[in-house]
Amino acid sequence: MYRKDEVSYFIVDAHVALWDARPENQRNIHGKQFIDCFYDYHRNLSPESEVWPYEEYLYQGGERLMNDLFRDGYVDHAIFQPAQLGEFYHRGFGQTEEASALAAAHPDELTYNHNFDPRNGEAGLDQLRADAERFNLQGVKLYTAEWHGNSRGWSLEDPWAYRYLEACQELGIRNIHVHKGPTIRPLDRDSFDVADVDHVATDFTELNFIVEHCGLPRLEDFCWIATQEPNVHAGLAVALPFIHTRPKYFAQIIGELLYWVGEDRIQFASDYALWTPRWLVEAFVDFQIPEELGEYPQITTEQKKKILGLNAAKMYDIPVPPELQLPAAEEPAVGPRGADKTAESADHLVGA
């Protein structure tokens, strides 16, 4: 929980990872390229006081994760979103055994999501069913630009992807987190294109599609999809750190998301250990839209509460203390918000 100016916020970090990118786990040069690209994002977008030494960044471990999130970081609950990247790392990038064991030991604080790759065919479907039972999965993290043999990406519209999504419906895995954002060396930018979300969101209305990184750099494409698909949500991982280095750019991102998508379908995420949540939570609570961007209304405290934790808590049935709750919202609206309103009526601009 975070408290400032007599206001308390329930915090759900909806995108965290426990990775191992140490040299002994790097399968080839691409493993080093990947983590080096991560580190460049980290050091270039973080306040100087929050930059880790490179060696520490390669592997953080469970003890440090628990400290950075829950003791120092204000987080009440966090959700693992692991990437496999087996072509780059011997034991994978996200550490399945360590992260899932940590979540099992701290069920009130951690939820473990897993991943799948439809290019694994029938064997992968069997593995998904086994993983769903083993981890009691509520969600999965998908990486459509991941390499697999000679393949350098896949689409949510692929026939095999549909079979996996159908299996998710059958298994009760309702939350589909898809990386649709900045490319990471050596992956291909176009394999992260957000366009395929439109198709599956229409065909799988019982599933939630959380677009991690809100489609950046294709924010406009994402907004035009999400505004007419009520089961499409925005994850703020990677977008949030621009609050420090490019506050005007972040204001445009959050302003567009609130206008097109609405306050009930945006989720806070630090993308730990890319960044730590403490400074992001503090900065977001303090943030206001700059005056020169007057076309966007100011962000209200209620909107910040929803984004920082209440939206993800609702999606994952995470208990929220009564004093930190807000009145239940109606079903998410579609279409742009507040097109005929003024900044003075900001509290009513966002559809429920």
Task: Label each residue range with its predicted role.
Residues 138-139, 153-268, 293-303, 326-351:
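Catalytic pocket-lining loop regions of alpha/beta-barrel enzymes
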Residues 60-67, 94-100, 124-128, 194-197, ...:
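Alpha-helical scaffolding within the catalytic cores
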Residues 1-14, 20-69, 77, 260-267, ...:
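Mid-to-C-terminal alpha-helical segments outside catalytic/metal-binding sites
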Residues 15-21, 179, 213:
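Histidine-centered divalent metal-coordination motifs
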Residues 76-191:
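Active-site gating/metal-coordination segments in enzymes
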Residues 22-29, 92, 125-127, 152-154, ...:
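Short aromatic-enriched loop/helix-cap "lid" or pocket-rim segments at secondary-structure transitions
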Residues 18-19, 182, 216, 274:
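Short active-site segment of divalent metal-dependent hydrolases/proteases
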Residues 15, 78, 112, 140, ...:
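Divalent metal-coordination and catalytic microenvironments
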